[in-house]
Amino acid sequence: MDTIFAVSSGLLPSGVAVIRVSGPRVVDIVKTLCGCLPKARFMHHGDLIARDGSFLDSALTVFFPRPHSFTGEDCAEFHLHGGKAVVNRFLDELSTFTGCRLAEAGEFSRRAFIEGKIDLVQAEGLADLIEAETESQRRLAVMGANGHLTELYRHWRNKLMTARALIEAELDFSDEADVSNFSSDKVWQNMQELSDSLCEHIAEGERANILRDGIKVVIVGVPNSGKSSIINRLAGRPVAIVTEEEGTTRDALEVRLILGGLPVLVMDTAGFRETESKIEQLGIDIAKQHVLDADLVILVDDMKNPQKISLPNTSAEIWRVGNKLDICEGDKTRWPIQFSALNGLNFDYFLKEIESFCLHRIAEIGNIFPARKRQIQLLKEAVKEIDSSINYTFLDLSLRAEHLRRASDALGRITGDIDVEDLLDIIFSQFCIGK
């Protein structure tokens, strides 16, 4: 197997650059460049000297002997000065060692999986942790990376294996009084409870999609109600055209925010009105589709001239808010939330209300739930097989046990315990090179 290396510390230049090396030639590489093999897992400071005798850098080196390393192989980290020329020269030197090459994306993590240091759920959690932009996404990633999900899935898989063992015992020793008909009550009761637990877990995961994808807030209203001014103030910069001419917003504009540690996608849409313009009507149709997909719809009224608007039926929560508070002198009681997007009057309160809505949406999400669609898909497959085993009472007992085996295999594919070779390239290609 090749020895692989890569920069693990991010973009250059930087104060420090960490070069990770893993594979069978690590000991030889460290001895050659450092002039010694440092004590395992201790920082060693010294000059790094190339094989031609030239000075590379004054650096810190750490040696991690197998199997007590991230990959399970011999590993080393070289902490260099983070200049591009320094790092490139060092990488060139590493490439001169026979069987030593630059790592592919996610190859360190893939080797850790192969060596049994992590499972697929933990690998996906690591990838999500690296990509996390918000506190909620970080918490979601940690749940997978720290092994809690793996423990749960293996616990459920053990329940399935126990049920199959009891069924096999009934099939093989049906003449024994203490075995006969045992599975007809206890096993199926346990399997129904397991199916219920899986369904609840799946529902938690689908609700928790907002932690990864973000809460979708759609702003709608008639033309010139101030929707574009709202999106500009939320963005903190002009992203939408603001004029007195109606119909200037034709397509949906997106602004990504972080509120209360949650990702929030806010969309400005075309003003709702009757129009003969095909382009404008297309924008209105797009706006209606976004309303259907929204978590929160904010219907904006011009407080000086409120107008009726017809929205498509949606499961989203709908707020009617009043804009242009700074120039409204009439009755204001109809709007629980009112502000001026133009000068910011009361706008902080509006923003806080959106944040409260977002936090409320995740308040009922449990502590452990599937983090990826792949996991949810396999959990649903497991439920389908368990339910078939429970409900198909007309089948031979051995066939019902086969459904439980398929359910067990589905859970095993989540963690990578069985038959996942075709998934490895997809999962580990999502990592950065140094991971």
From Swiss-Prot:
InterPro entries: G_TrmE, GTP-bd, GTP-bd_TrmE_N, GTPase_MnmE, MnmE_dom2, MnmE_helical, P-loop_NTPase, Small_GTP-bd. GO terms for molecular function: GTP binding; GTPase activity; metal ion binding. It is found in: Cytoplasm. It holds the Pfam family MMR_HSR1. GTP binds at residues 224-229, 243-249, 268-271. Binds 1 potassium ion per subunit. Keywords: Cytoplasm, GTP-binding, Hydrolase, Magnesium, Metal-binding, Nucleotide-binding, Potassium, tRNA processing. Residues 214-359 form the TrmE-type G domain. It is an enzyme of class 3 (hydrolase). One of its GO terms (cellular component) is cytoplasm. It comes from the Bacteria. Its EC number is 3.6.-.-. Disulfide bonds: none annotated. Its cofactor is K(+). Mg(2+) binds at residues 228, 249. One of its GO terms (biological process) is tRNA wobble uridine modification. (6S)-5-formyl-5,6,7,8-tetrahydrofolate binds at residues 20, 77, 117, 435. Exhibits a very high intrinsic GTPase hydrolysis rate. Involved in the addition of a carboxymethylaminomethyl (cmnm) group at the wobble position (U34) of certain tRNAs, forming tRNA-cmnm(5)s(2)U34. Belongs to the TRAFAC class TrmE-Era-EngA-EngB-Septin-like GTPase superfamily. TrmE GTPase family. Homodimer. Heterotetramer of two MnmE and two MnmG subunits. This is tRNA modification GTPase MnmE. It comes from Bartonella bacilliformis (strain ATCC 35685 / KC583 / Herrer 020/F12,63). The lineage of its organism: Bacteria, Pseudomonadati, Pseudomonadota, Alphaproteobacteria, Hyphomicrobiales.
